[in-house]
């Protein structure tokens, strides 16, 4: 019998708890080839970390009075890769959009110009949101890694298609600091786009857990 709790056992226990106690849907995105697009995320490019179908489905439900074309416009703004921005600046910009909504303009059926905001997350009634726990998602580098490098975080928690929580797990006999030094630090370097929407980073080996921001 193993004298430690394996990373995989921790991951599976976490996913089961999220699903059965907290009401998350669970999606295993692992593919044998990192570049394979058929992973259930509906991304057209593995550099993207936002799930477009989840986001649009949520936005249509949360914004019934806004034309679909304007919702598409808002989603395009959210999904902009912000390659020229630092992760901190991109995170600040997306935080504002998630908190306040994405401003749009349109003419209503009477021809009157409307100024509204596309709501991305329902903060008053969390049950209106789409909760998804994603495991083993391949993400292609846009950072300073070698060309076509891929990274695969253990678990990412999505709300309405937005990756808000990053979770890195280790065997219980591995120092938790290794999750920071070996994984989180390299993700900052290789796939900084993962942290543009990030609200929390969680590092755990089941015996010890740390929660903080990506900075």
Describe the function of each predicted region:
Residues 1-215:
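An alpha-helical interface "stripe"
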């Amino acid at each position: 019998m193993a004298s430690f709790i394996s990373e995989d056992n921790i991951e599976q226990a976490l996913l089961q708890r999220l699903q059965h106690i907290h009401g998350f849907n669970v999606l295993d995105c692992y593919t044998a080839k990192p570049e394979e697009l058929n992973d259930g995320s509906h991304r057209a490019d593995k550099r993207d970390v936002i799930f477009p179908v989840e986001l649009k489905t949520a936005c249509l439900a949360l914004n019934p009075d806004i034309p679909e074309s304007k919702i598409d416009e808002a989603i395009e703004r959210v999904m902009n890769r912000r390659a020229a921005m630092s992760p901190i600046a991109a995170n600040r910009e997306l935080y504002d959009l998630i908190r306040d909504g994405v401003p749009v303009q349109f003419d209503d059926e009477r021809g009157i110009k409307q100024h509204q905001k596309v709501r991305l997350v329902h903060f008053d009634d969390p049950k209106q949101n789409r909760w998804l726990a994603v495991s083993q998602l391949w993400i292609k580098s846009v950072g300073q890694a070698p060309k076509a490098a891929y990274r695969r975080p253990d678990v990412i928690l999505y709300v309405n298609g937005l990756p808000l929580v990053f979770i890195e797990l280790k065997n219980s006999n591995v120092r938790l600091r290794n999750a920071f030094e070996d994984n989180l630090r390299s993700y900052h370097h290789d796939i900084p786009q993962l942290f543009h929407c990030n609200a929390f980073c969680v590092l755990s080996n089941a015996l010890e857990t740390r929660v903080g921001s990506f900075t």
